[in-house]
């Protein structure tokens, strides 16, 4: 019924959020690599830019871990809504 529908919707939302976060992590990884390259090979980039890029990447990676947890929790909730055993 409604509980299964809600649990399934929550799972799909968590799945989409994780996919978007994975893209964000990839983009920030690329940005960090480019920033490090510019820092090492030019005089146009400060070390602060490298640190900022690292901080952004680490923050996104932490958010990705939280998104993965939310997806697992949503899967458990869906399993339980379908009549599975409680954990």
What kind of feature is each model-predicted range?
Residues 1-63, 70-81:
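Amphipathic alpha-helical coiled-coil segments
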Residues 82-87:
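Terminal intrinsically disordered/low-complexity segments used for targeting and assembly
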């Amino acid at each position: 019924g409604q509980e299964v529908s809600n649990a399934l919707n929550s799972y799909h939302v968590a799945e989409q959020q994780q996919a978007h976060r994975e893209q964000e992590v990839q983009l920030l990884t690329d940005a960090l690599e480019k920033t490090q390259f510019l820092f090492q090979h030019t005089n146009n980039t400060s070390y602060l830019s490298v640190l900022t890029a690292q901080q952004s990447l680490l923050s996104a990676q932490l958010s990705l871990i939280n998104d993965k947890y939310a997806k697992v929790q949503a899967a458990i909730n869906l399993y339980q809504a379908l009549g599975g055993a409680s954990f």
